[in-house]
Amino acid sequence: MDKIALIGDVHANLTALEAVLEDIEKRNISKIYCLGDIVSKSVNPDIVIDIIKEKCDVILKGNCDEIFSSERALTRQFWTRMKIGEKRAKFLRELPIMHEFYLSGKLIRLFHASPYSLEHIYNPEYNNHDKRYNNKIIINPMELFKNTDFIGKSKNDKIPDVIGYAHLHMPIIFKVEDKIIFNTGSVGASYNKGEATYTIVEGELNSQKNMNMSISNVSVYYNLEKEIKYIEESDIPTKDDIIAYLKN
């Protein structure tokens, strides 16, 4: 059986990423897929990008990766944009949107947020009442399985059996009709203080034969004070906001 670790929303949190990678290594997992949002929030985006490039077999683009790598980055994004430099920014801009593969006969499709954009959001826990996303809220979970131009799919392409996404920062796994949806939670910006989450899928990789497979979410605690020290010692102008976010 093959094991794949799926991580997302690292958000430049080096301490959390190191803790997760250590946990993945202890579990003898050799394949790691990243579902985007490598940068933003914390203060080591350059180091985190380099580690992700080295360790991950698949890397997808998140909404923050797109925004913070832009040559038109706004003032609040400028610190990160300067920190990562043009070479890393170009790497982020050129990341793919979607990845899919067979595991034990199931077609698994991965993206950062949705088949519509890098910002649309589906949140089953809170009835999707989030004013930040305005008209980018997905109500019906089956919409996550749609084939769209945004992810390079046509109506004639096979509909996946499993959807894995990030963006939400909340680890979830549930069935809808005959399908499965899971969210990786967040490595670097979890809603639980000092906790990083990721997902493990296990089965026969690249096999279209129906066999046993499993999906599980994992929580790892990291040294929050160490990450806060990184932030305090930096010259990022939004350090107070970042520390408050990580602590609360």
Kindly give the residue locations of the regions a language model identified:
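Active-site-proximal beta-strand elements of phosphoester/diester hydrolases
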Residues: D2-H11, L107-S114, I181-G185
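Core catalytic region of metal-dependent phosphoesterases/phosphodiesterases
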Residues: D2-R93
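Active-site environment of divalent metal-dependent phosphoester hydrolases
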Residues: H11-A16, S40-V43, C64-S70, Y116-S117, ...
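Glycine-rich phosphate-binding loop signature in dinucleotide/nucleotide-binding domains
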Residues: I24-I29, L103, K155-I159, I200
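Short acidic-hydrophobic surface loop/beta-edge motif
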Residues: I97-G105, F174-V176
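Active-site-proximal loop/helix segment associated with metal-binding centers of metalloenzymes
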Residues: A113-F150
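Hydrophobic, aromatic-enriched interface-forming segments
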Residues: I137-L144, F150-H169, I173-V176
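Acidic, His/Gly-rich catalytic cores of divalent-metal-dependent hydrolytic chemistry
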Residues: I173-N248
